[in-house]
Swiss-Prot record:
GO terms for cellular component: axon terminus; cell body fiber; chromaffin granule lumen; dendrite; endoplasmic reticulum lumen; extracellular region; neuronal cell body; neuronal dense core vesicle lumen. Residues 163-182 are annotated as: Disordered. Belongs to the opioid neuropeptide precursor family. It comes from Homo sapiens. It is found in: Cytoplasmic vesicle, Secretory vesicle, Chromaffin granule lumen; Secreted. The modification Phosphoserine is found at residue 251. GO terms for biological process: aggressive behavior; behavioral fear response; cellular response to cAMP; cellular response to oxidative stress; cellular response to transforming growth factor beta stimulus; cellular response to virus; cellular response to vitamin D; chemical synaptic transmission. Residues 1-24 form the signal peptide. Residues 196-207, 217-227 form a propeptide. This is Proenkephalin-A. Disulfide bonds join 26-48, 30-52, 33-65. Proenkephalin-A is cleaved by CTSL to generate Met-enkephalin. The N-terminal domain contains 6 conserved cysteines thought to be involved in disulfide bonding and/or processing. It comes from the Eukaryota. Residues 163-175 have a biased composition (Basic and acidic residues).
Length: 267
């Protein structure tokens, strides 16, 4: 008893779905029959659906429709091939976009408009590349030439970089072998060089000129030259400072900062 109740419950649940499926199939078959006939008025669509569902005792219209459907079955593969052909069109467009890249992005709207204005016939599909070349002129050729020029320019840049690196390496090798060229190029700044006697004399002169500025020494010989050059400015400044003989008395009065730096502050 419980199994019977369960079966009835399942039938009640699945019944509306099955009826809807049967109705949909019947209406689709009857619509196909009326479409296949030269004169659709020869078949009553409502009567055909009701006979298919079993609501009418007469089955004349439904039998005629079934015979027509059986005769039209060989024509279905042709429809299937047309659908396959329609599905293959997006794949072909995807391959074209993948192949020509920037050209499709640049001139895509123009090509689409041309396709709408001048649709391609089935006989012309075999020679698609020639027709594209004739239809779109030199656009595709120009794009290919641009790609070739970019590739050539990148190769040329690589060659220039490689030659520059080789030249720099050879130059460094020659510079390591020849120390005189390095000294001429960098002037001894990059590495320490042995000074000639002439350079030693110049260094001594520089030491004499600026050395006493950092330590307490007497007035140099070139004091008169500076005196002539700067007029009475240095003279007035020197007169304002105490002499060396008065250093002891002056050291008692000067601040501790002047004691620390000595002649640097007094000069």
């Amino acid at each position: 008893m419980a199994r019977f109740l369960t079966l009835c419950t399942w039938l009640l649940l699945l019944g509306p779905g099955l009826l809807a499926t049967v109705r949909a199939e019947c209406s689709q078959d009857c619509a196909t029959c009326s479409y296949r006939l030269v004169r659709p008025a020869d078949i009553n669509f409502l009567a055909c659906v009701m006979e298919c569902e079993g609501k009418l005792p007469s089955l004349k219209i439904w039998e005629t429709c079934k015979e027509l459907l059986q005769l039209s079955k060989p024509e279905l593969p042709q429809d299937g091939t047309s659908t396959l052909r329609e599905n293959s069109k997006p794949e072909e467009s995807h391959l074209l976009a993948k192949r020509y890249g920037g050209f499709m992005k640049r001139y895509g709207g123009f090509m689409k408009k041309m396709d709408e204005l001048y649709p391609m016939e089935p006989e012309e599909e075999a020679n698609g590349s020639e027709i594209l070349a004739k239809r779109y002129g030199g656009f595709m050729k120009k794009d290919a030439e641009e790609d070739d020029s970019l590739a050539n320019s990148s190769d040329l840049l690589k060659e220039l970089l490689e030659t520059g690196d080789n030249r720099e390496r050879s130059h460094h090798q020659d510079g390591s072998d020849n120390e005189e060229e390095v000294s001429k190029r960098y002037g001894g700044f990059m590495r320490g060089l042995k000074r000639s006697p002439q350079l030693e004399d110049e260094a001594k002169e520089l030491q004499k000129r600026y050395g006493g500025f950092m330590r307490r020494v007497g007035r140099p010989e070139w004091w008169m030259d500076y005196q002539k050059r700067y007029g009475g400015f240095l003279k007035r400044f020197a007169e304002a400072l105490p002499s060396d003989e008065e250093g002891e008395s002056y050291s008692k009065e000067v601040p501790e900062m002047e004691k620390r730096y000595g002649g640097f502050m007094r000069f």
